Amino acid sequence: INRRIAVTPASILLEPLPKTQAVAVAAARMLDRAAAAGEIDFIGGFGAHVQKGLTSSDENLMRSLPAALSRTQRVCSYFNMGSTRAGLNMTAVERFGHVLKELAFRSRTGIGCAKVAVFANVPEDNPFMAGAHHGAGEPDFAVNVGISGPGVVKAVVEQNPNCDLTELSEVIKRTVFKITRAGELIGKEVAHLLGVEFGIVDISLAATPRAGDSVAEIIEAMGVSRMGRPGTTAALALLIDAVKKGGAMASGHVGGLSGTFIPVSEDAGMIRAVRQGALSLEKLEALTSVCSVGMDMFAVPGSTPPDVLSAIIADELSIGIINNKTTSVRVIPVPGKRAGQIVHFGGLFGSAPIMPVSRKASKDFVIRRGRMPAPLQSLRN
């Protein structure tokens, strides 16, 4: 169990203060010390909502990010750069490619980039790092619970090798119902003991590097020969649908991301699929059209140009914007590493094979900047 806490977006807290890097870094270090004193593993919220533009505080926070995250251990950051209602802030996306490169080269493994995620349609009550923050519509305090539990789901899938897909969906739904009920019960009791409000249950299946705690292995237990091969997207869609239906029946307060995470470095099955050539960067992006969190915890060569990183972010966030869903990117350019090598982060972050990526991206498109208009489906009133 990891203890996590999230604060109001730091750009709001820093708005009345001097717009200097020293102030932003000092704020990050203060959060880091507070988390250490409270024995909190990660503290989120060092971020901003910039989907329509950047305030002076937002710009200062973004400039300060490499220094802030390289000088702290527990602080996590997020930036919401797009939404179905607002479109995509391509100016922020273009700048962020350079921020990621600088952040990566401040550590030997690029681990700082594992503590920052770029979002479209970010939820305000997400309990999972690195995107967790305490949204403007939240009460003073709230307890939000993430259920995780891929190992339990994998076990029940393996126990039902001969049922058809309708029956398989029912089995998964019943299992997630039980997990969600337990999570809500624990969350409400913790909230009661703390004297604060209970928020939501995030019913996401979230992998860890531990053996048997893999979302990819659920997909393989369903009959796909290896994660990433033909059939993977359909199996993942079935899994996510069953998870949502089971969780929604179990709790009246389902929120956060609530789907299925497919981080590369934190999932043993995903790592194996990449190393065996079954899962490419392009297939990972395709899977995010049905999964909840986007392209998560994947490593690319340290020589990857900033405009390529920005283009990857723009592609992924566009999927979320057009489909009115949350998507995100956590990409780690690893200094000195080439495609096919592996980097070890340790702990919850696991290890990641370096995935090949085209160095000839779309620089002329990325440097146009500006704001990509919101899609037609944003007009829903």
Model-derived regions, located:
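Anaerobic metallocofactor- and corrinoid-dependent redox/one-carbon enzyme cores
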Residues: 1-381
